[in-house]
């Protein structure tokens, strides 16, 4: 009996030594790993919103605060690391490769969400929407945050140039459309994807806008992309593809020659899958590469 006990203890001791050595080996291997840094986390205290907001920042290769180079800025709604920040940043980096050279090196500002239903919607007259979106209707405050706090903050802290782009999908697309129609001068380029124009029974489509008038002289490029999305979650039946087309038709009626509108229908994508492909297409349409041959 004693013999078996001693033998078992020897086996156990041997196994423990093997596990310890394997653990030390794994620790040694992982200790040589270095973090892969894609961007930086910044914060801004907003008086307009009454809260602190997280910003995910991508700075292009070669960026230096002490340099005199200034970069276009892309403002990305739904810009958390677990939303659209990582893959959209990758698209801009890819399209900036020297053998592609479709977009210039750019600063990406991902605006992390707190309450997108609150921030991306204007007040609605539809009771069903009021009941379902109980915090909704504060987009004016969020637009004020972008205009009066965020853009000045980015301009002051980073080497931001004059060119500004906004990207928004779904309710983010609704907000981008509202800014386009109400405060178009905030951005030079608008990438609007699957906009939730059904909100408030499509009242945004009835809005008059300075960009439709001949005396609006700021050059604007607008991309509107939509997939095969079908019925919107609205009280009155609305089809999202139709609403997107109505927005395009509204903009193309403008007598303003400085407004350039690009419509993109992606029938192989739906509301959940469209963003990545649409942003890629938008960069191609808004920034055509001249023939190098």
State where each predicted segment sits.
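Bacterial Sec-dependent N-terminal signal peptides
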Residues: 1-32
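Non-catalytic cap/lid and distal C-terminal segments of serine-dependent acyl enzymes
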Residues: 28-293
